[in-house]
């Protein structure tokens, strides 16, 4: 579809959406349908520490901040295939990194700023490779840490292991993508940061990097937008995101600015769309309790039940 036609879809009538959207340029679905990233949390109980966590995140006086937008602001990802050369990477945190090799090269996009994330999806194997503090280094690649994920699996990283994110979670599954907004539905939670995290993690997170302040949320904490939030004044495209925030919510995945949520680099994002998302107040979110949904400690799979009420359809 021509970019102008896609923009017309976002600006006007949104097309019906399938239950999942493959990574653009691949046939790879991002995790199975019973993965926690894709859990509908709209009916889950409110977490008993919801108000405390929101207080530490300054929710009362803060609005959401889209950490992406035009012209090239956000997190890159690259699609590769079996023809791309694989390399070994020298890791700072090798004991908590997957050894690889990685399809990383001088052609790989690296996120700007201090985190320098590099995300690569192998379209032939549906494998996600992620690096933190990635540096090509003249053909002697280095990174702070690295993680490899089978996009067809619910397996989590070993407990206590970091990833390219402080929470030990994958980054790509939590990024807002333009193709999803244009299709009319987002079927997963979105990655969010906060300045203050407690030095602990809860499912599905696997790693902590916080403080001893128990008022702060742990890595893996999940927040959903209240069902009563009025989206009538927002554009059709912004309402797609609002619906996802009500249904799938936000997962605390890293330390950073309060209520910053991430998306991919895409030249089709517009300032008007991003500015609308900045009007969503953080006080309209609630932390949810996912403990009743977990199938097993080392799995990202969820199972509906009395303690995990999931809407049908």
Predicted segments, located by residue:
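Secretory targeting and sorting signals
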Residues: 1-20
């Amino acid at each position: 579809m021509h970019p102008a036609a896609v923009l017309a879809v976002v600006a006007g009538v949104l097309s019906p959406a399938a239950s999942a959207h493959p990574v653009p340029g691949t046939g790879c679905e991002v995790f199975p349908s019973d993965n926690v990233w894709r859990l509908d949390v709209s009916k889950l109980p409110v977490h008993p520490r919801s108000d405390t966590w929101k207080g530490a995140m300054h929710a009362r006086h803060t609005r959401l901040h889209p950490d992406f937008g035009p012209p090239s602001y956000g997190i890159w990802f690259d699609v590769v295939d079996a023809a791309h050369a694989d390399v070994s990477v020298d890791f700072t945190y090798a004991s908590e990194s997957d050894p690889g090799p990685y399809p990383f090269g001088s052609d790989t996009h690296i996120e700007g700023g201090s985190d320098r994330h590099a995300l690569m999806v192998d379209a032939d194997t549906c494998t996600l490779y992620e690096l933190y503090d990635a540096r090509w280094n003249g053909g002697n690649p280095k990174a702070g840490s690295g993680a490899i994920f089978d996009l067809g699996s619910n397996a989590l990283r070993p407990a206590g292991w970091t990833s390219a994110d402080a929470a030990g979670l994958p980054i790509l599954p939590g990024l807002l993508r333009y193709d999803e907004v244009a299709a009319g539905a987002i079927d997963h939670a979105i990655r969010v940061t906060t300045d203050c995290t407690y030095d602990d993690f809860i499912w599905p997170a696997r790693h902590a990097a916080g403080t001893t302040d128990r008022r702060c949320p742990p890595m893996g904490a999940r927040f959903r937008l209240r069902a009563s939030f009025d989206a009538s004044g927002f554009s059709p495209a912004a309402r797609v995101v609002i619906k996802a925030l009500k249904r799938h919510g936000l997962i605390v995945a890293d330390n950073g600015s309060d209520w910053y949520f991430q998306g991919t680099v895409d030249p089709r994002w517009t300032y008007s769309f991003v500015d609308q998302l900045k009007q969503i107040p953080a006080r309209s979110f609630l932390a949810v309790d996912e403990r009743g949904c977990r199938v097993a400690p080392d799995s990202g799979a969820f199972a509906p039940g009395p303690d995990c009420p999931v809407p049908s359809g």
